[in-house]
C-alpha cells in the first residue's frame, strides 16, 4: 500500500479523500508572500531572535492556559501554539500536545490553496478550523489561525490548537 504522500491522483473532496498538500501549493498570485531573508545574520543575533521566537510561542501557550478557563487546557495541557512561515512551514511549535502540531501546517496549506484567491487572505483575518479531513486531529480540536502581514506581504502564521 502506498504512503499518503505518494498518492498523486486522488482529489480532495472532504468525503472520501482527505486533503494532502501538493509539493507546490497553488496559491493565488494576488496574495503577496514575504520572500526576503538575510543570509548574513551573525550567530549572536540569530540566537537572540531564535530564543525570542521560542519565548513568544511559550507565552502564547501560557496565555491560553490562563484565560481559557478549561481544566483540559490548564492541567492536561491539551493545546499547542505554533509559528509557521508564510507558506506554512514550521518555525516553532509549543511543548504541549505534539500531535496537534503535526496537523497545523496541513490546515494552513489548505487555507493558502483554497482561500488565497476567494475570498482572499488579508491583514486582520482569523480562521477557525476543526475539519479532520483537512487538518484537525479530530472535530473536538479547534484551530485558531492568524496570518501576519508586514508591509502588505504575508510574513508568517500564528496558530493555536485547543
Question: Where are each of the predicted segments found?
Answer:
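Glycine/proline-enriched, intrinsically flexible loops and inter-domain linkers
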Residues: 2-123, 131-150, 154-162
Amino acid at each position: 500500500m502506498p504512503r499518503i504522500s505518494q498518492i498523486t491522483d486522488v482529489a480532495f473532496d472532504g468525503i472520501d479523500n482527505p486533503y494532502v498538500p501538493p509539493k507546490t501549493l497553488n496559491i493565488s498570485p494576488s496574495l503577496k508572500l514575504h520572500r526576503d531573508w538575510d543570509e548574513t545574520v551573525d550567530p549572536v543575533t540569530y540566537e537572540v531572535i531564535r530564543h525570542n521566537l521560542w519565548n513568544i510561542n511559550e507565552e502564547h501557550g501560557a496565555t491560553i492556559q490562563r484565560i481559557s478557563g478549561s481544566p483540559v487546557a490548564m492541567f492536561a495541557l491539551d493545546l499547542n501554539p505554533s509559528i509557521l512561515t508564510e507558506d506554512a512551514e514550521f518555525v516553532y511549535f509549543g511543548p504541549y500536545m505534539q500531535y496537534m502540531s503535526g496537523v497545523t501546517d496541513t490546515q494552513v496549506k489548505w487555507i493558502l490553496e483554497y482561500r488565497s484567491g476567494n475570498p482572499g487572505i488579508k491583514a486582520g483575518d482569523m480562521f477557525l478550523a476543526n475539519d479532520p479531513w483537512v487538518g484537525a486531529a479530530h472535530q473536538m480540536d479547534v484551530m485558531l489561525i492568524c496570518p501576519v502581514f508586514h508591509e502588505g506581504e504575508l510574513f508568517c502564521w500564528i496558530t493555536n490548537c485547543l
